[in-house]
């Protein structure tokens, strides 16, 4: 065996995430924010998980901090299935972009896919709030869903910052919800981090890691 890694450290390596303050993120059915910490630390409430990153050594502290949000792409898919079944995901993004920032008061809490670690394993469910029958339409719901997911990400990222992580850059694959300009712009604006998209996946990283581990490449 020349290389081994869990799915998220492996994904982070495929996205060139090695240094403190760098973040690897995915936004599929569930969403992940995986950041690199340069000092040994942990969250006392275990809302995020800490373990050795792929480039950790006894002389170099590189720890991966993992946040998982269960209600990410599954919320977007639920909205598509139940609110906008007649349009594509790309058209959903256009609908969302037609609504002002903040969805004119509509708020969606995206925790509807089971217990959330970031909430200390509470199962609070998803909720939609602030709908005015005289003002709001489905475009507001589409946008509020994406905004709610972003703020759930940022809630977890604040925990990482409390652990000493200076979040500067988010790396993500060019796929799933990161295909939405609105999602990307909102996440960048709220988190204050830049976002870089990569045409890659974890399988490519595993192959490269195995070759490096075998000593074929240095």
Q: What does each of the following model-derived ranges do?
A:
Residues 1-171, 176-218:
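Active-site core segments that coordinate phosphate-bearing ligands/cofactors
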């Amino acid at each position: 065996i020349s290389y081994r890694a869990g799915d998220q450290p492996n994904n982070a390596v495929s996205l060139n995430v090695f240094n403190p303050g760098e973040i690897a993120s995915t936004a599929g059915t569930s969403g992940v924010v995986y950041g690199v910490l340069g000092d040994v630390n942990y969250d006392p409430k275990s809302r995020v998980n800490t373990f050795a990153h792929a480039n950790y050594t006894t002389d170099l502290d590189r720890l991966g901090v993992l946040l998982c949000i269960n209600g990410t792409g599954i919320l977007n898919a639920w909205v598509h299935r139940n609110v906008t079944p007649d349009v594509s995901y790309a058209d959903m993004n256009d609908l969302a972009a037609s609504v002002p920032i903040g969805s004119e008061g509509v708020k969606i809490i995206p925790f509807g896919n089971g217990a959330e670690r970031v909430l200390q394993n509470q199962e609070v469910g998803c909720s939609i709030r602030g709908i005015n029958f005289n003002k709001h339409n489905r475009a507001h719901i589409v946008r509020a869903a994406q905004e709610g997911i972003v703020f759930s990400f940022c809630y977890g990222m604040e925990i990482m910052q409390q652990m000493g992580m200076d979040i500067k850059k988010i790396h993500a694959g060019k796929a799933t919800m990161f295909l939405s300009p609105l999602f990307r712009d909102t996440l960048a604006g709220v988190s204050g981090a830049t976002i870089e998209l990569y045409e890659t996946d974890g399988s490519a990283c595993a192959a490269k890691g195995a070759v490096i581990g075998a000593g074929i490449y240095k």
